[in-house]
Swiss-Prot record:
Pfam family, one: Na_H_antiport_1
Protein known as: Na(+)/H(+) antiporter NhaA
InterPro entries: Na/H_antiporter_dom_sf, NhaA
Residue ranges of coiled coil: none
Family: Belongs to the NhaA Na(+)/H(+) (TC 2.A.33) antiporter family.
Keywords of the record: Antiport, Cell inner membrane, Cell membrane, Ion transport, Membrane, Sodium, Sodium transport, Transmembrane, Transmembrane helix, Transport
GO molecular function, one term: sodium:proton antiporter activity
GO terms under biological process: regulation of pH
Task of the protein: Na(+)/H(+) antiporter that extrudes sodium in exchange for external protons.
Primary location group: membrane
Keyword Cell membrane tagged: yes
Length: 438
């Protein structure tokens, strides 16, 4: 299969995903820059105070709510992880992760891209209070990485874009596992049993192919609360909920009805404005077309713009702001070096070496249309950790270790920026060299 066939095989969903994520990456970057500017301006006290503002309602002596920062990190980010879970489920069932042959190469690449950065960080920070931050450089920000790769346009093979997307999805799955295993404290088993009960009810609804999203979302709120109270980060509940959303589509009767409506519309007279009959037909077509979509597709379609243009930019604005002044101890343990080297060196080396070895051992096969030089370029772009790395840094370091958290955020910004610039320049030069050889 050549590159052209690969491009033709790229689904409409994947193309739309690339477009939305690439623009989202640029918007994300602007919000991160704005956060740094505000955090180092005369507005910095107001900026930091804003995120600690309690938001909720009072019932007697009880306050139900969180600080604005917790609403973003625990509640809104749960919606982001719900979308991530839906993407992972879709890829596992129908996409690039749906078979061992398709999934093995990007999954192994993601594994190498997580292990190497984690080991680099842990080696530099072993036996220090900051060693728990090894998960920070293990993540990849798909929005930023795709934003960079889309700016390069046709200079990058479509097959490489597909590989990077699949790698990032597998990386997200790995990040979820890391959060569940290593950033969970003080487990409360009674709440875990409650969460398990909710999951069983969701599984029954899925088995019965209940297509309305309302019961899933209502139970999802209950699941989020149980998981939040159990000591596991609540975003894990969102991923579990995503895997319970049905993916089956209804019978073909809706297709016949759509065809009949289309014929009726074609038979109506055309004019400058739509007639009442035409409007009614189009409304019916819209309803029937929506009914043909699976609940998973409907929810993913709804969440994609909210996540890309509201949740993630807001998360970036709330978390990327670090006041860079003389009070920051950049030498706290080796957090700065561990994160930067993990992202800029560990990611590309881990991805390149593990895929190279696995192909030589005939465990996996490199996708057609991608050279080893391309794999190295994708590895460099995978070093853009940003939002996922920021999220893990919030889990790894508590307020008692605030210095390490602030240094980690500076390191994430620097490491992601370096990876993005070097990766883009590398792929640009690679394309120029290939053009000169032709």
């Amino acid at each position: 299969m050549n590159v052209k066939k690969t491009e033709n095989a790229l689904s409409v969903t994947l193309k739309n995903f690339i477009k939305s994520e690439s623009f989202g990456g640029i918007f994300l970057f602007l919000n991160a820059v704005l956060a740094m500017v505000v955090a180092n301006s005369f507005l910095k006290e107001s900026y930091f105070a804003l995120w600690h503002t309690p938001f909720g309602f009072q019932i007697g002596d009880f306050f139900i709510g969180f600080s604005l920062h917790n609403w973003i990190d625990d509640v809104l980010m749960a919606l982001f992880f719900l979308m991530i879970g839906l993407e992972i489920k879709r890829e596992l069932l129908f996409g690039e992760l749906s078979s061992f042959k398709k999934a093995s190469f990007p999954v192994i690449a993601a594994l190498g891209g997580m292990i190497a950065p984690g080991l680099i960080y842990f080696f530099l920070n072993a036996d220090t209070p900051s060693q728990h931050g090894f998960g920070i450089p293990m993540a990849t920000d798909i929005a930023f990485a795709l934003g960079v790769i889309m700016l390069l346009g046709k200079r990058v093979p479509t097959a490489l874009k597909v590989f990077l997307i699949t790698l990032a999805v597998a990386d997200d799955l790995g990040a979820i596992v890391v959060i569940a295993l290593f950033y969970t404290t003080n487990l409360k088993f009674a709440w875990l049993l409650g969460a398990l009960g909710v999951v069983l009810i969701l599984a029954v609804l899925n088995r019965l192919n209940i297509r309305s999203l309302i019961p899933y979302l209502l139970l999802g709120v209950l699941l989020w609360f149980c998981v939040h109270q159990s000591g596991i980060h609540a975003t894990i509940a969102a991923v579990v909920l995503a895997f319970m959303i049905p993916v089956k589509i209804p019978k073909d009767s809706k297709n016949v009805e759509l065809l009949e409506l289309g014929k009726r519309y074609a038979e109506t007279s055309s004019g400058v404005l739509l007639t009442k009959e035409q409007q009614e037909i189009l409304h019916s077509i819209e309803e029937k077309a929506s009914a043909l979509q699976s609940p998973l597709e409907r929810l993913e379609h709804f969440l994609a713009p909210i996540s890309g243009y509201f949740i993630m930019p807001l998360f970036a604005f709330a978390n990327a702001g670090v006041s860079v002044d003389s009070s920051i101890n950049l030498e706290v343990d080796k957090v700065l070096l561990g994160v930067i080297l993990g992202l800029c060196l560990g990611k590309p080396l881990g991805i390149f070496l593990i895929t190279f070895i696995s192909e030589k051992l005939k465990i996996t096969a490199r996708p057609k249309g991608i050279s080893w030089w391309h794999i190295l370029g994708a590895g460099l772009l995978a070093g853009i950790g940003f939002t996922m790395s920021m999220f893990i840094s919030n889990l790894a370091f508590t307020s008692e270790h605030k210095d390490a958290m602030e240094v980690a955020k500076i390191a994430i910004l620097l490491g992601s920026l370096i990876s993005g610039i070097i990766g883009a320049l590398y792929l640009f030069v690679l394309d120029k060299r290939a053009a000169l050889k032709k």
